[in-house]
From Swiss-Prot:
Record function comment: F(1)F(0) ATP synthase produces ATP from ADP in the presence of a proton or sodium gradient. F-type ATPases consist of two structural domains, F(1) containing the extramembraneous catalytic core and F(0) containing the membrane proton channel, linked together by a central stalk and a peripheral stalk. During catalysis, ATP synthesis in the catalytic domain of F(1) is coupled via a rotary mechanism of the central stalk subunits to proton translocation.
NCBIfam families according to UniProt: ATP_synt_b, PRK05759.1-2
Protein's UniProt name: ATP synthase subunit b
CDD domains assigned to the protein according to its UniProt record, in alphabetical order: ATP-synt_Fo_b
InterPro entries: ATP_synth_B-like_membr_sf, ATP_synth_b/b'su_bac/chlpt, ATP_synth_F0_bsu_bac, ATP_synthase_B_chain
SUPFAM superfamilies: F1F0 ATP synthase subunit B, membrane domain
Record gene name: atpF
Family: Belongs to the ATPase B chain family.
Membrane topology label: Single-pass membrane protein
Subcellular location field: Cell inner membrane
Length: 156
């Protein structure tokens, strides 16, 4: 194998090329590759952190939803209890008012009954007095007495 000057020059040029490449081209290239690797690693870490935050948010939202359902059920139960209480109060008040009205009606009926009874007694007294006057004005015999009593009874 013949080594000639052109092969040596080519080897020297190649070594210079490698040296220049290692000094000027390789460092920015490795920096760019390192920056890209770091950027990808940061992106993956951010994605993992985002996934964890999403899981935590889902858990928290489920807990809040469960708590909201519990509170809603509690509020509905309280509303039902309050409604039942109001209905019972209204029923009791209606019963009391009904009993009061019945008592007032009974009292009024009793007063009307007593007034009618008093009026009837007055009328009977008036008729009895009128009948007694007629009997005393006429001659007293059995037939006229029976006839006057029948008239009085028919008037009553």
């Amino acid at each position: 194998m013949d080594i000639n000057a052109s092969l040596i020059v080519q080897m020297l040029v190649f070594v210079v090329f490698i040296g220049l490449t290692m000094k000027f081209i390789w460092p920015p290239l490795t920096k760019a590759l390192e920056a890209r690797r770091k950027n990808i690693a940061d992106g993956l870490a951010a994605a993992e952190e985002g996934r964890k935050e999403l899981e935590l948010a889902e858990i928290k939202s489920k807990e809040q939803l469960t708590e909201a359902k519990t509170q809603a059920a509690h509020i509905i139960e309280q509303a039902n209890q309050r409604a039942n209480h109001i209905v019972e109060e209204a029923k009791n008040k209606a019963r009391e008012e009904g009993a009061h009205l019945i008592q007032l009606a009974k009292n009024e009926i009793e007063q009307e009954y007593n007034a009618a009874k008093t009026e009837l007694l007055k009328q009977i007294s008036t008729i009895a007095v009128a009948g007694a006057q007629k009997i005393l004005q006429r001659e007293v015999d059995k037939a006229s007495n029976d006839r006057l009593v029948d008239e009085l009874v028919s008037e009553i």
